[in-house]
């Protein structure tokens, strides 16, 4: 059985990935064909991934990981009456992260992989929708949060 892997150069510092056994690690350094990662209790002796022999693997984003990072299942009060659809499908899994002046919604459709990440930041009068098509992995959510200017939230993510 072939498992999904990540090219080292596509990772960023603070991204979460795992080894071939599923052990979670956080990236500390990235090169063209290698990446260093560390895990709790082993900060002084980093693990080396490479694109040839020991490739990093993605960590699937789960409800438990979202809850550990302050996300909650359901809609914000502003969204309770709204109906979400994308391409005619309705969503059955909606996760929200409130950051005071705005909220972040992660929405999964009930009949297909993929979904939508909505940033509603009222403090900057900004509303941003990002659509993803595949199963969302932790490092992909981290990257998306960084692209939206939410570096602290992305870099302090826990698995």
Predicted regions: what they are:
Residues 1-11:
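Mixed-charge, Lys/Arg-rich low-complexity intrinsically disordered regions
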Residues 43-72, 127-157:
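Intrinsically disordered, low-complexity, charged/polar segments
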Residues 101-135:
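Intrinsically disordered, low-complexity regulatory segments enriched in Ser/Thr/Pro
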Residues 21-24, 45, 102:
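Short acidic/polar mixed-charge low-complexity motifs
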Residues 28-51:
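Basic/aromatic-rich interaction segments and small domains that mediate binding to polyanionic partners
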Residues 16, 22-33:
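Short beta-strand-centered aromatic/proline hotspots
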Residues 73-112:
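Amphipathic, interaction-prone secondary-structure segments
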């Amino acid at each position: 059985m072939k498992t999904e892997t990540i090219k080292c150069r596509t990772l960023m510092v603070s991204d979460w990935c795992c080894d071939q056994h599923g052990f979670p690690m956080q990236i500390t350094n990235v090169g063209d064909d290698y990446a260093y990662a560390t895990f709790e209790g082993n900060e002084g002796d980093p693990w080396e991934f490479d694109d040839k022999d020991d490739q990093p693997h993605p960590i699937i984003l789960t409800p438990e990981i979202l809850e550990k990072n302050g996300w909650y299942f359901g809609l914000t009060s502003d969204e309770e009456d709204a109906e979400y659809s994308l391409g005619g499908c309705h969503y059955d899994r909606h996760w929200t992260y409130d950051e005071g002046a705005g909220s972040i919604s992660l929405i999964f459709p009930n009949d297909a992989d993929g979904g939508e990440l909505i940033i509603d930041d009222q403090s900057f009068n900004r509303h941003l929708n990002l659509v993803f098509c595949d199963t969302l992995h932790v490092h992909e959510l981290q990257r998306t949060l960084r692209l939206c200017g939410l570096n602290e939230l992305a870099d302090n993510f826990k698995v």
